[in-house]
Amino acid sequence: MNLELQLHAQLERNDIREEEKLELVKRNPTVHFEIPSITFGEGRQSRVSALEIKKENTTRKVIWKRCGVEKKLQKEEAENLCKRLVPYREVLRTHGWNVPNIFYSEVVEQESGYVVFSYEELIEAIDTERMFKEVSTAHFERLAVLQKIITTLTNKEHEHLVKKEYFGRTFSQLPYGIDLKLANLILDAQGSLHFVDFFGPKELTPEGVWKTYNTKLDSLSQEKLLVVCATREGCILRMLKLALRHLPHKDMTIVYFNHFKDIITHSPLPEYEKQYILQELENGFPLLTSVYEESKV
């Protein structure tokens, strides 16, 4: 492990006092932590921070992720996930998703198990979950998120999707899985939408099953996870429900409900997919109720 990773591993330890951690940073002046303008924190699987690296009068900001925190991953499990980060990112890029560059990733041992340290390109914007919740967010910005997702999911790389049956219905199977939720998306100032979460790479085999699946990371069964993360209809429905949930005021729900219906109706989605998604939207997302039961989306 190089010096920079050794430093970061030390800073992650819970048995070192904050004063000692500050001394570690002072003794390593080439790595500077700053309080970022964007709010970062802990997700279900990862801790995320912004780093400012200063070397030879140049400054570069990167995202530092600690993936698999508190998941008690074995070394082999962490290594399998780590080695799939770059290939998975390339699969997404090939299919039209904007994804940040990964500079470096490494498996690191901690007291609670093995985690993956990942250093990635910083996209200067907040995630779309926070954006949706902000009262000051422009109306068109929220609508742009859904419209851009559908634009990507209907591009030429998605023209001939394989049909698979789940829950007694035929769905359009994506050639990859993707955890499409608002917290994993960033809309930048130029209007480009970026998918920024590669951990737990959701790659599929040619037969349409998961290349890597780990119950430590995913609470859903493999089939249910396929429905909401690897079918076009399931991905869109999940996004619609999350978008309606994260509006800042309840009285905005009906306005966005109708706008979302218009976006689906006028989208290039196949007609049978449109009708199914609209029916699910009107009926309160029965598919998602079946998938998640009592769990949260």
Where are these regions (language model features)?
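Short, solvent-exposed loop/turn segments that connect beta-strands within catalytic domains
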Residues: 54-60, 109-114, 189-192
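Conserved structural core of kinase catalytic domains
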Residues: 96-151
